[in-house]
Design a protein with these regions (language model features):
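Helix-rich catalytic cores of soluble enzyme domains
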Residues: 112-154
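A cross-domain feature marking catalytic cores of carbohydrate-active enzymes
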Residues: 72-74, 108-110, 146-148
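Conserved, mostly hydrophobic/aromatic
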Residues: 56, 109, 136
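Alpha/beta catalytic barrel-like cores
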Residues: 1-105, 115, 131, 141
Length: 154
């Protein structure tokens, strides 16, 4: 039943012009100097995701802004008890409810390596990150921030 509801929201987002999308092409165009003059806010919605995503879309529309990244870090998934499927469904539903038209950028934020786990078993830690990425991509995320900064000794 839950999967059916998620599927309905996913399909509605596609049909209503608010699909989950990768921000890659926009960033590449920006790097080539083809677009400029704007910033891209990235917001981590930890609670009231449906309401907050809708509020972000309404605010963006009122400013004629077209790009927002909705993020949820792996650590936030744990303490907010939100899995990728729940998060993206709430974001997309909030965007649809706000009348948003345009790509919806949902990102798995700071999929971070644990230095102690990596030192003990690099392959197991790497597989943990791979698994987290697979779950997010299967849920519909199109952007993942893999953070290996913890493995560098400055």
């Amino acid at each position: 039943m839950i999967e059916a509801a998620r599927w309905i929201i996913w399909e509605a987002s596609q049909l209503l012009g608010a699909p989950s999308a990768s921000i890659h092409d926009l960033y590449m165009a920006r790097g080539r100097g083809e677009v400029s003059g704007f910033t891209v806010p990235a917001v981590n919605l930890r609670t009231q995701v449906f309401d907050m995503a809708g509020a972000m879309c309404r605010a963006a529309a009122s400013l004629d802004a077209g790009t927002i990244v909705f993020e949820l870090a792996r650590s936030e998934q744990e303490y907010t008890y939100q899995r990728p499927g729940e998060y993206i469904t709430s974001v997309l539903a909030g965007c649809i409810g706000a009348g948003w038209r345009g790509p919806v950028f949902v990102q798995g934020d700071h999929y971070q390596f644990n230095a102690k786990k990596y030192a003990a078993d690099p392959e197991a830690m790497t597989e943990e990150i791979r698994r987290a990425c697979r779950l997010a991509m299967e849920a519909g995320y199109r952007n993942i921030d893999i953070d290996s900064s913890t493995l560098v000794d400055l």
